């Protein structure tokens, strides 16, 4: 392997911008600062959506079921 071509892999804390939740994980993402997590200082990366704020994981998901072509035809011509 060539030397000095691989990104620096390290422990990073991802911070959810919406909820403020913190997740420690390994990453090569560029840090946007530092944050203290469980008594240690780690590089920090802010993210907009995590499992703590995504509607699928929080149970606040809205399901929009689109009508198919047959349903639209039946509604248009009153064939229900």
Swiss-Prot record:
Keywords: Ribonucleoprotein, Ribosomal protein
Keyword Ribonucleoprotein: yes
One Gene Ontology CC term in the entry: ribosome
UniProt keyword Transmembrane helix, yes or no: no
Gene3D superfamilies tied to this protein: Ribosomal protein L31
GO molecular function ontology, one term from the record: structural constituent of ribosome
GO biological process, one term: translation
InterPro entries: Ribosomal_bL28/bL31-like_sf, Ribosomal_bL31, Ribosomal_bL31_B, Ribosomal_bL31_sf
Family indicated by similarity: Belongs to the bacterial ribosomal protein bL31 family. Type B subfamily.
Subunit structure: Part of the 50S ribosomal subunit.
Name assigned to this protein: Large ribosomal subunit protein bL31B
Organism: Oenococcus oeni (strain ATCC BAA-331 / PSU-1)
